[in-house]
């Protein structure tokens, strides 16, 4: 299969192939191949940016819904890439992100936007109206970890994946 790809790339003059044995073979991009690589890279970057913007818009809608439910200040639980998108989406909304927590000690005490990442036990000290779980892959696990906050008047929301249907509580 790889040989078929190499043959196609060579026939389309995207690569040049030199050598006679597996040990002496070399594959180099031609000028046409370099142009094609740049074109593909630009297309990839445009698609990635478009996906980011779509996710940000979807998260903004969900954050607005959370705000309308009475949660005006929130802590994000999870300091990963999803949290970055959620945090950025919140900047143009009335919902105020007043803290961020993460279970990973390596992330704690580091800067996230204008906030310092704290350990989850700090949630009550921050005094949010709610906690938004910003980890798509571990939502249920995190929810179980902090669901006792609901008895203390702190709502816990699963924001879900921006690419799937709304998965909030």
Annotate each PLM feature.
Residues 1-14, 20-169:
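Hydrophobic, well-ordered beta-alpha structural blocks that scaffold small-molecule cofactor pockets
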């Amino acid at each position: 299969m790889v040989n078929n790809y190499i043959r196609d790339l060579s026939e389309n003059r995207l690569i040049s192939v030199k050598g006679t044995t597996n040990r002496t073979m070399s594959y180099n991009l031609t000028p046409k191949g370099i142009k094609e690589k740049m074109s593909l890279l630009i297309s990839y970057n445009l698609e990635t940016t478009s996906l980011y913007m779509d996710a940000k818009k979807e998260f903004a809608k969900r954050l607005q819904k959370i705000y309308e439910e009475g949660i005006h200040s929130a802590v994000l639980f999870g300091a990963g890439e999803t949290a970055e998108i959620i945090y950025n989406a919140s900047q143009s909304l009335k919902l105020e992100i007043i803290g961020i927590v993460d279970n990973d000690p390596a992330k704690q005490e580091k800067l996230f936007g204008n906030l310092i990442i704290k350990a989850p036990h700090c949630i009550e000290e921050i005094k949010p109206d709610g906690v938004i779980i910003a980890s798509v892959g571990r939502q249920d696990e995190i929810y179980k970890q902090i669901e006792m906050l609901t008895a203390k008047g702190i709502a816990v929301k699963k924001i879900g994946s921006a690419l799937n249907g709304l998965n909030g509580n």
